[in-house]
Amino acid sequence: MTAEKAEGATGFAGFDPKSVEPYIVKDPESLAINMARAAEQLGKAASAWLAPREAGEKTDSFAEPVSDMVKTLSKVSEYWLSDPRRTLEAQTHLLGSFFDMWSRTLQRMAGDAVEDPANLQRNDKRFADEDWVKNPFFDFIRQAYFVTSDWAERMVRDAEGLDDHTRHKAAFYVRQIASALSPTNFITTNPQLYRETVASSGANLVKGMQMLAEDIAAGRGELRLRQTDTSKFAIGENIAITPGKVIAQNDVCQVLQYEASTETVLKRPLLICPPWINKFYVLDLNPEKSFIKWAVDQGQTVFVISWVNPDERHASKDWEAYAREGIGFALDIIEQATGEREVNSIGYCVGGTLLAATLALHAAEGDERIRSATLFTTQVDFTHAGDLKVFVDDDQIRHLEANMSATGYLEGSKMASAFNMLRASELIWPYFVNNYLKGQDPLPFDLLYWNSDSTRMPAANHSFYLRNCYLENRLSKGEMVLAGRRVSLGDVKIPIYNLATKEDHIAPAKSVFLGSSSFGGKVTFVLSGSGHIAGVVNPPARSKYQYWTGGAPKGDIETWMGKAKETAGSWWPHWQGWVERLDKRRVPARKAGGPLNSIEEAPGSYVRVRA
């Protein structure tokens, strides 16, 4: 087979021995000195990690997650090791794969162009350096990594007798181990790292270990992995700058109203209920990407709930408190500021789940102020809730509740780490390599600044969410109890615009689609391209991605997709049209706050509190 006949086929006939030149140490004395300096910085990192533990300020709970991982993976290994025939099958498959890999390597050494098998992911960004293919040593390591990872995933996939949750957890843990042990994460097995270390005589490691010490100190004994240059951003100065006012606040939230940019506005105001797991300004990163600014420019009177970054004082604030003191409070303020009782609403992620539960409570109480709801990547049925379910079972929740009881909240870093682990090969290890092994400062990126601006969660709120939604799926079953009432989404008759994103790993499209059938009224289901953030924050001017529209969300999403219409670009104009079809009446533009005195300029002070 020739290179022309097979795309991706490679051989080593053109391998030039001179290409090993960049891998030969030229100045061993400088390298030795820098290695000593790197070790000194590593010692400072260790001291920064130990100091809060020796002072009794921090205790570690490594045992629980490690124990759970070992217990889960042992169930997989038990299946394969309990029967000699299965053991032989597993060993034969792995050894056969390595034999094939060795044969391909020998053929390439002989100058033959050999195509990689399908399970070798040649488009993996981690292996972009050309020496991963051109250099026989690194090519062999690359192949061995993918072969072994594929085999481990197959062992989980083919193990019989596992319940769905155990299999899901096992697959997740295998992916975490594979991501951590990737040869791209080590100097001696990553050609680019090896060359850079030789070229700089180890200066990259000195800088990297210095950054490691700084990041552990910044995390008060925990690694606060820097994903972007946070010094380049300031909330209210070059991020979250759409003009507006904070017009009310309580212990749970501030209510913001944004200044009109059009002469007339839609009669119905718009209330946005963002997640409290992150901060609302993901919808207002900058003027070019701001959904809030775009909505204002379409004639929407936009109100936003800015949740408090809680501390021990908020330990008892549960879902009812967030429904009453968040959404209910905001509705009262909107009526005072505008005189309007009828409101359109948006809920994003867990903010959408809270909004849906509040709508069910309002239906039971006869509160009809919210006349439509738009849900961004929101789950109300958690049957197919994705990889976050890995962290949710009764044992893990009880352990988490015990930890939260000591402080009254869940540390923001814990939730941030969980989200980053969902995409460890993209959100953890590339930054580990760039920062601590290459010694390079990360580039400024507004979305990653927002991602690093984590929030705490009140103990009562977080426990209620995990148990009632992820563990017991009570909302979709009509079994959730709020304010002493059992609430049902079937009682929610108002129009729903339900947006899912195709590549969402937090609220999978399949899960969002299934939840559509829980509501008692008409649901317009829309599927956007990309993922949990980029699929939502997709302004029309960028002409990126696409969205699908179709019939009623019944049956399964695959059948729905087969009949859906694909439209290039952003879904935002489609949503605006949906809102205006519900009520297109307009009134003169409103002053922010109306008769209410503003407290401060948007984005307010609550959003500036860091975890």
From Swiss-Prot:
Name used for this protein in its record: Poly(3-hydroxyalkanoate) polymerase subunit PhaC
GO terms under cellular component: cytoplasm
Active-site residues from the entry: 349
Enzyme Commission (EC) number: 2.3.1.-
Protein family per UniProt: Belongs to the PHA/PHB synthase family. Type I PhaC subfamily.
Upper taxonomic lineage: Bacteria, Pseudomonadati, Pseudomonadota, Alphaproteobacteria, Hyphomicrobiales
Pfam family, one: PhaC_N
Gene that specifies this protein: phaC
Assembly notes: Monomer.
Taxonomic superkingdom: Bacteria
Molecular function via GO: acyltransferase activity
